[in-house]
């Protein structure tokens, strides 16, 4: 991605997690990932699509577990990619492993209406 391209996802860190995720008015899907993780790279474009298409219903955030180990540890993330959906500051759904767009939307739709 070049500097001129704007990502639809937001980058969160250990320092910004409480503000960007836990205090959000919208549900936030956090992608716990790492630069060296092949499956993480496969799911990244799917998450960008969801972030763009469902921006009114959902925020998609990315947290690099190598540079932000505290948050990953706090939520017991042991495998990546792990996606955790937060609603009203609480984790309400955990999805481990790379999944396609339709499967992700289906899994999230029971918590976030309007995703199907």
Swiss-Prot record:
Gene Ontology terms, MF aspect: disulfide oxidoreductase activity; electron transfer activity; glutathione disulfide oxidoreductase activity; protein-disulfide reductase activity
SUPFAM superfamilies: Thioredoxin-like
GO biological process, one term: cell redox homeostasis
Domain Thioredoxin: 2-113
Gene Ontology CC terms, in alphabetical order: cytoplasm; cytosol; extracellular region; peptidoglycan-based cell wall; plasma membrane
Disulfide bond sites: 37-40
InterPro entries assigned to the protein according to its UniProt record, in alphabetical order: Thioredoxin (IPR005746), Thioredoxin-like_sf (IPR036249), Thioredoxin_CS (IPR017937), Thioredoxin_domain (IPR013766)
Keywords of the record: Disulfide bond, Electron transport, Redox-active center, Transport
NCBIfam families given in the database record: thioredoxin (TIGR01068)
Function statement: Participates in various redox reactions through the reversible oxidation of its active center dithiol to a disulfide and catalyzes dithiol-disulfide exchange reactions.
Family: Belongs to the thioredoxin family.
Protein name: Thioredoxin
Organism: Mycobacterium tuberculosis (strain ATCC 25618 / H37Rv)
């Amino acid at each position: 991605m070049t500097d001129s391209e704007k990502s639809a996802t937001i980058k969160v860190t250990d320092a910004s997690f409480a503000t960007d995720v836990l205090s959000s008015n919208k549900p936030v899907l956090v992608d716990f990932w790492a630069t060296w993780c092949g499956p993480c790279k496969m799911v990244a474009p799917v998450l960008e699509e969801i972030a763009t298409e469902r921006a009114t219903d959902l925020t998609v955030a990315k947290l690099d577990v190598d540079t932000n180990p505290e948050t990953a540890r706090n939520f017991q993330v042991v495998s990546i990619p792990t996606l955790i959906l937060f609603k009203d500051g609480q984790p309400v759904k955990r999805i481990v492993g790379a999944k396609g767009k339709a499967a992700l939307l289906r899994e999230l739709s029971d918590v976030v209406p309007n995703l199907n």
